Amino acid sequence: MKNKYILNALILGTLSISTISCSDFLNEELTTKRNTEYLKTEEGVADLSVALYENLRYHFARENSVAFTQNGVDEFTVGGDGSNASWNSYDGNYGPTVTSNSTKPEELWDEMYVGISNANTLIQNVKEGGYTSVATMEHLGEAYFLRGFNYYTLVAQFGGVPLKLTPSTTPQREFTRASAEDCYKQIVEDLKQAYTLLPATATKTGQMTKDAAAHFLAKTLLSRVSERNDDWNASYKEQDLKDCLTYAQEVISHHALAPNYSDLWNYTGPDGANEKLDEIILAAQFNADKSGNTGNSYNQTHLYYISIYKDLPYMKRDIPGEREYQRLRTSYYTYDVYDKVNDSRFWKSFKTKAAVNNPKNSTYYKKGDLGVMYVINKPGDTRYSNVRMNDEVVYSKTGKTIPTVFVAYPANKNQAGDNAMLDFTQFYPSLSKFIDGYRESVTDRVGTRDGILARVGETYLIAAEALVRQGKYQEALGYINTLRDRAAYKQGEDREHHVDGGAAYKSGAPGYKDNGENTYMAECSYYESNGIAETTAPTSLKITDINNLPAEDEAVIRKLGYTSAYDRMLCLVLNERTRELCGEFQRWQDLARTKTLVARARAFNSIAAANIKDYMVLRPIPQTYLDGIQKNGHALTAEEKQEQQNPGW
């Protein structure tokens, strides 16, 4: 909820036994009896509900946003900065304890239990207070939603976890993990409570609604019946799939897709048009207020997908080009899974051109000339001689050579599987969905964009997958084709047009006055990559025959060795999730729940392939939790710790 203070009265969850840096959001003074009593009042309940929203920000505020969700999968591999390399390579450093400069397993665990503890406190205080006002019932719904959402997040990563459903008044150290089945039961119950209590329409920016609960109910039910749970979920499948589809259809009936896929990423400033789209069901709220610049108070996801450009000729780092953390490098699976002639989503998701912003004393180049270009072409292309070409390729609009061009399939290495550009760890087309040009300086990490937690584009794919699991393949294509219809080029559309959050860098942006240089180009390498004549004709991506899927999908299916109709269609759904949701902090969970993680990582992520094992579809339980809990008043033995650890770890 924007422009509202974030309550400092978070109650530390007792399951977060490891040392947590609470100084960002825990005001020790509020552990006094006076303030505990205040939280029991109806006004205190309202204040505590604000803290629930602060917890949602965590998913965008730190490196865990990508470490837990996008590392070690098919879409991306590790980039030039290896801070989270172990999460991609599954090497010996990746386990219950992660050392070095890297995300730790306990970080997500601890933060989710902090939110759960706040939700537990609010739920108990409302019930004990006997409050029944409309506003307080909505706050109760928010607490049930967050508790269900946080447990869903934990189960998606770790499997069964300890279920804590009441607040703690004294320190507790004796816990055991509930089964995944029991956790799912609780998640469904909490989200159903939220669905009943939350308003149908948000009255405040970013408010949880009935549709948010329905979306995550559908997602939870789909997860419960997925392959990772096949050792116990048989009795749930029929009803869960029916209910999943019902909830998804309800959400779809209430939310329109953005007319143009690029509308989602056309960020021009806080609270701009792209943050108010009807497609967005729920988003963690951020803005340009730096007064609370700690903890979860700003969005850092703009940093992690960006490749190096400051070291290339006639270039230097600037605000719209972003600060290059280069944590995640785009994979060839991602390059090739799109129909790059007819599907606009690749070109609207990735930055393939940047302008000269540092010509120095050059008499040939000036600011605004095309300085860097990534050609994402197809195997067999012979137009470009090398993977990197300096001052060789001519830009047709100016007649000048382009200082730096990288080519996915150069003539001397242009067969499927050659992956020439992966020889460069620092240079690749950056995912541009989260770029933030509204920052104050080139080094500023403080992002201002909202973080999307649910949008109806995904809801369509949830519905499609539910139908695939019911064997209703043609019906599933209907939902997939709706997204593909939006992705196709429309009559008159400029296919080389590109927008991203760099567009927020303009006269009104905080950093514009002192940092006028600008690498932003509202243009992509569509024509240079595809090698076709300019056109404004419409395209079609409609799939009509499940036995004759698009060439991009058939290639993945062959690579993975699928033959059954079900495996082929589930593969299509997962491929479509890449095309629609690439980089949106969901991939690891999707591949883990469908037990396709290992096969896809081995096929499309050569760094992960060497170490990934079948048991790695579950994360290791944090060692800090195992070391901190007790049994019968004593620390756990090594054997007792292993009993609570996931298999293989």
Which sequence ranges carry the predicted segments?
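Long, intrinsically disordered, low-complexity segments
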Residues: 21-22, 82, 95-99, 112-113, ...
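Acidic, glycine-rich segments characteristic of secretory precursors and extracytoplasmic regions
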Residues: 2, 10, 21-81, 88, ...
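Conserved, well-structured interaction surfaces
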Residues: 42-60, 64, 82-158, 172-185, ...
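An aromatic- and glycine-enriched ligand-binding surface/loop that stacks and positions planar moieties
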Residues: 23-84, 222-403
